[in-house]
Curated annotation (Swiss-Prot):
It comes from Chromohalobacter salexigens (strain ATCC BAA-138 / DSM 3043 / CIP 106854 / NCIMB 13768 / 1H11). InterPro entries: YciB (IPR006008). The keyword Kinase does not apply. It is a multi-pass membrane protein. This is Inner membrane-spanning protein YciB. Belongs to the YciB family. HAMAP family: YciB. It is found in: Cell inner membrane. The chain crosses the membrane at residues 23-43, 54-74, 82-102, 120-140, 150-170. Plays a role in cell envelope biogenesis, maintenance of cell envelope integrity and membrane homeostasis. One of its GO terms (cellular component) is plasma membrane.
Length: 189
């Protein structure tokens, strides 16, 4: 259910845009939808992830600028800004506490050598930088409707492919005892 709630604002943005061909109207729907999403997550789980707060702030600021100035470039830059902020966070996180951000998120579930965590983390940095750059390329090169489609399907598809690749990488680099321990835990359930 959480994934559905996370996906709802962009799905509404996409639907409103394709029903109206009006990016300003779609942005006007996106802002309260994102606010409602974060409010629901807080109400339901009593915590909101930093990523959701950053996204909310950028939707309000850049979406607001899109509406106020009647300029779609602001909302089109938002995915790039979000991705580049994430890349920066993944890059500098080891300077604060020694662990990579990916290890902080997944380290309790998976035991990996420090070098593997660093490579995974750098892969995420590269992915976020590339995704931000691809977004700029798409909105600068193609029409608005193509960008809206890319925002939903292209970015989601690229992210799913990257996560699948990460899964393959993790499976190849997990210590054998971790794999067998996880298999035994599954058998116990």
């Amino acid at each position: 259910m959480k994934m559905l709630v996370d996906f709802l604002p962009i799905a509404l943005f996409f639907a409103v845009y394709h029903l109206s061909d009006d990016i300003l109207l779609a942005t006007l729907v996106l802002i309260p939808a994102t606010l409602a999403q974060v409010a629901f997550v807080w109400w339901r789980y009593r915590r909101v992830e930093k990523m959701q707060l950053i996204t909310l702030a950028l939707v309000v600021v850049m979406g607001g600028a899109t509406v106020i100035f009647h300029d779609a470039a602001f909302i089109q830059w938002k995915p790039t800004v979000v991705n580049w902020l994430f890349a920066f966070a993944f890059l500098v996180a080891p300077l604060f506490g020694g662990k990579t951000l990916i290890e902080r998120m997944m380290g309790k579930a998976i035991a990996l050598p420090a070098a593997t965590w660093r490579r995974l983390n750098l892969a995420w940095v590269a992915f976020f930088i590339a995704l931000g750059a691809i977004n700029v390329y798409v909105f600068k090169t193609y029409d608005e409707a193509t960008w809206v489609n890319f925002k939903l399907f292209g970015m989601l598809g690229l992210t799913l492919l990257f996560v699948l690749g990460q899964g393959v990488y993790l499976a190849r680099h997990m210590p054998r005892d971790t794999l067998s321990q996880n298999d035994h835990q599954k058998d116990d359930v």
